[in-house]
Amino acid sequence: MLFLKLVASVLALMTIVPAQAGLIGKRSVFKPKVMIINMFSLEANAWLSQMDDLYANNITVVGLNRLYPQVHCNTQQTICQMTTGEGKSNAASSIMALTLSPKFDLTETFFLISGIAGINPYAASLGSVGVARFAVDIDLINSVDLRELPSYFQSSGWEIDTDPYENGSSNEIVYPESMPYQTNLYELNNTLITAAMEIIKDVVLEDNEKAASYRKLYNESAARRPPFITQCDTATGDNYWAGTYMGDFVSNITNVLTNSTGHYCTTQQEDNASLTALTRASFDGLVNINRVVIMRSGSDFDRGAGNITALANLLNSTGHVSSLACDNLYHAGAPLIDHIVNHWSYWT
C-alpha cells in the first residue's frame, strides 16, 4: 500500500514538473514591454477578462501579496499584470518584491498603474479617467481634532514642518521648509503623459443609467458630464475619506506642493507608495521611473451633492459605480498599451 502511494506521488510530480519546466524553458527571465499594476481583484479582472491571453504565463513571485501571488503575462511575454493588494503597505511591498525578483527584467518596461478612485466633482464625473502628472501624499501631515483647535482653523491638518499660525487667522496651508519623508510629492514624466493623452484623448468611455442618474444630483458641470478622459492629479491617503472640507483640504495641499501647477481630481490609497518602490528600484537601475503612467477612474464622488451629507455620501452604495470605473480603466489603458507594444521604437 505504501509502495502504491509512493508511485502515485511520483506520477503526480511527473505531471506537474514538465509544465513548470516548460514555462521556464521558454524564457528564464521575463522582459515585458508593459506591466499593468492593479490593486484588487475587481480592477484586475477588468484586464484579465478583456485582454487576450494574459493567463498564458503565470509566474509566482516571492514577496507578493498572498491573495495575488502571481504575475500574469501573455504568450508573447510583452504584456504582464500584477495585483498588489489595497493600501500603501501592500502596494509598496508588492511592487518592491516584483522589482527585486530575478524572474523579471524590468529595465525597459512601461508601468501602467490602473485603479479606481474617489473623484472630485469639480474636475470630472463618475466613470471618468484621470491621468496624473502629480501624486500627492495627504497622510504626511500634522493633525489635531477640529474640536480642540481655534474656531478659525479651516481644517484639522497642515503640512509637517510648517507653522499653522504663519498666516495668522487665515490658517492657510503653506509650503513646508523641508520634506523629510521625501515621498510627499511625485511628479511623473510629463512628456510621457502628454504622449499618452494624445493617444487616448478621444476614446469613448462606457456609461450606464446608474451613473447618469446619480450625476444629475450634482450642480458642477464636470460632474454632470458623461465619462471622459482628462489630465488631472491624484491624492494618496490610507484613510477612506469624504466631504467638502476634506476635499478642499486635499485641493489646497495639491496646489501648495505643486506650486499651483497640479489640479486634484482623484483620491486613492496606493500611488505614492507604489511610486516610492519604483523610485528606489530606479535608483539601482532595476526600472526606469520615467516610464510610469497613472490612470485612475472615478468610482464614487469624494463629496455629497446638495443636501447629501459627507457621511451619507461615504456610506451610500447607490453612488458607487466600481464596475463601470474598472471597465473604463481598460478602455482608456488598452489603446496606450497596444501602441507601446506595436510601436516600440517610437517609445524607446
From Swiss-Prot:
Its main location: endoplasmic reticulum. One of its GO terms (cellular component) is membrane. InterPro entries: Nucleoside_phosphorylase_sf, Pur_nuclsid_perm. The keyword Transport applies. It is found in: Endoplasmic reticulum. Residues 1-21 form the signal peptide. Keywords: Endoplasmic reticulum, Signal, Transport. GO terms for biological process: nucleoside metabolic process. Coiled coil: none annotated. GO terms for molecular function: catalytic activity; purine nucleoside transmembrane transporter activity. Belongs to the NUP family. Probable nucleoside permease that transports adenosine and guanosine. This is Probable purine nucleoside permease C285.05.
